[in-house]
């Protein structure tokens, strides 16, 4: 069972102090979290890609390279690379370079994105985004598999026997597909035999089970062995010493993160009752004491069969002292218990869906 942390690099004012980071200080803060996660022994650090002033990071590979230079073992991944708006050749080159810098620790989570800014910026029609994604994913898979690439598609110029250096240190860059709630995306990941990451940001854990079932059924039906059909999960995350302390502290930041920032804008206002419900035993929100966190991740493993959990740890203007304490508790109290429990009890329920 792998455990890690995620930053989407949102830039929001701390609701308690009004403090707002500039992009540079926010990026340096994120680098410090990656270093802290490595020092604490976590497995994965993930970083999002966005293209608006509300977020600090538009190029995850650059920031991950900064983290790579100061770390030794933690795996470094995008979450997600917005493949529909990127050139797969450049994406592969960037992460192959990161793989060389990090001595074999780079990964890509490719997805379609729930944010529209990148589509306008890179002149991609959102109406075509699934077809564009499939086309570019096909090229990215070819780039992973071959040193000399011959490929043709609809949304990028063809390649005819071209070398695309550099090659990564790993035989192939690990590639996961990021999926929100779309059954067709889960089916695609399974048919391709790629590991899948589910983004669970609301509702009940059990509501995600059909996506896990679609994914594994598609993969097994396509002839892929069960062991390659790995499933990861991301969710909003905050752990503190006590259950009530975690909820009382986190709610203002969670509300700030999700509320619409402009009239009619993206997001929603989370009431205290809604927060309590989604933070409950089967709710998607991962906040509470270390023991509650352990219990919920084990429940997710039982219901969904997850191999990897990544918590989004720095949202809504959370100050570094709270984020660092959350990382510390994840690494020192949650992770050892989960590793012991999952080593002693192999998955059954989720894998047999």
Predicted regions mapped to residue ranges:
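An alpha-helical appendage that flanks or caps ligand/catalytic pockets
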Residues: 5, 130-164, 206-306, 339-353
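Hydrophobic faces of well-ordered beta-strands that scaffold small-molecule active sites
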Residues: 3-5, 45-47, 76-78, 106-110, ...
């Amino acid at each position: 069972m792998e455990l890690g942390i995620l930053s989407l690099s949102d830039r929001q004012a701390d609701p308690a102090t009004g403090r707002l980071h500039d992009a540079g200080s926010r990026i340096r803060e994120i680098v410090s979290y990656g270093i802290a996660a490595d020092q604490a022994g976590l497995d994965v650090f993930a970083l999002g890609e966005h293209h608006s002033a509300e977020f600090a990071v538009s190029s995850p590979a650059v920031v991950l390279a900064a983290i790579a230079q100061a770390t030794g073992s933690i795996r470094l991944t995008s979450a997600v690379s917005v493949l529909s708006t990127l050139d797969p050749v450049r994406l592969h080159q960037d992460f192959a370079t990161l793989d060389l810098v990090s001595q074999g620790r780079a990964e890509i989570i490719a997805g379609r994105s729930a944010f529209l800014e990148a589509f306008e910026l890179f002149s991609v029609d959102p109406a075509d985004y699934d077809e564009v994604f499939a086309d570019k994913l096909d090229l990215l898979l070819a780039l992973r598999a071959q040193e000399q690439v011959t490929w043709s598609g609809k949304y990028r110029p063809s390649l005819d026997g071209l070398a695309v250096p550099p090659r990564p240190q790993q035989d192939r860059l690990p590639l996961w597909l990021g999926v929100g709630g779309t059954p067709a995306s889960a089916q695609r990941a399974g048919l391709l035999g790629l590991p899948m990451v589910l983004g669970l940001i609301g509702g009940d854990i059990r509501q995600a089970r059909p996506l896990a079932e679609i994914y594994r059924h598609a993969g097994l039906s396509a002839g892929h062995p069960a062991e390659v059909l790995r499933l990861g999960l991301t969710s909003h995350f905050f752990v503190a010493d006590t259950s009530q302390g975690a909820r009382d502290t986190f709610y203002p930041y969670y509300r700030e993160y999700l509320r619409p920032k402009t009239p009619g804008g993206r997001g929603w206002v989370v009431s205290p009752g809604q927060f309590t419900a989604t933070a409950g035993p089967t709710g998607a929100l991962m906040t509470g004491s270390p023991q509650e966190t352990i219990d919920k991740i084990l429940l997710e493993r039982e219901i969904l069969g997850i191999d990897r959990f990544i918590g989004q740890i720095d949202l809504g203007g959370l100050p570094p002292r709270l984020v660092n304490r959350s990382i510390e508790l994840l690494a020192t109290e949650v992770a050892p218990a989960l590793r012991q429990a999952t080593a002693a009890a192999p998955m059954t329920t989720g894998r047999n869906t």
